[in-house]
Amino acid sequence: IKKYALISVFDKSNLKFLCNNLIKHNIGFVSTGSTCDKIRDLGFKCQEISKLTKVKEMLDGRIKSLNHKVHASILYKRTSLSHQKSFKKLNFPKIDYVIVNLYPFKKTQDSTLDKNKIIDMIDIGGPAMLRSAAKNFESVTTICSPTDYKKFINNLNINKGITSIKFRKLMASKIFEHTSKYDSLISTWLKEKKLTKKIKLKYGENP
């Protein structure tokens, strides 16, 4: 069965380097919206998730990858016959690599007071995919930052198209640390007390 990388990235830096090296190992691409468009613009074939799931993106992009087929492809145990049978019925590509970076919540929070813009940067589908892949680290490799692309490709090259279990565990630990910090930033923002004007004072007066 051909292996696929699910790529969904807000930060599209070094995407050409990543794709160029993945195709050398006969790894296909599955992606969402703008990332899929970017991969195609770079000259690579890419299957769009919404076409594979037969469920269109909805709610202005809030629902893209939250689909049971996507997560089954990431989470199923490769060593379990019952899991293999269930997955086969879905007729969905086998995802062995999940490369996702999250919406820039902190950067947006620091650059605007617009509540709606900040809320839009609370990523839901991205963390879900990363955590699914990290849970199944025995079979699936997960990457959350372009800074890890070179390490990832080097590990693939050394091991002739697969990553080592040591590398997968290391990346999985990074995912849970990363998503935990991301959630903490959101939680802190939600708890912040907004300053409001209580008394209108004349210039020079003290309350």
What spans do the regions from the language model cover?
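N-terminal glycine-/serine-/threonine-rich phosphate-binding loop
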Residues: 1-29, 34-52
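Short coil/turn connectors at secondary-structure junctions
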Residues: 1-4, 24-27, 42-45, 68-71, ...
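General beta-strand structural signal in soluble alpha/beta enzymes
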Residues: 7-8, 28-33, 47-51, 76, ...
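Generic structural signal for well-ordered, non-membrane alpha-helical segments
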Residues: 11, 15, 32, 67, ...
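Short acidic, glycine/serine/threonine-rich loops at helix termini
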Residues: 17-19, 40-44, 57-61, 108-113, ...
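Glycine-rich nucleotide/cofactor/substrate-binding loop typically near the N-terminus or early
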Residues: 34-105
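A short, charged helix-loop
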Residues: 97-120, 124-163
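Active-site loops and adjacent core secondary-structure elements that bind or stabilize anionic groups
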Residues: 151-155, 163-207
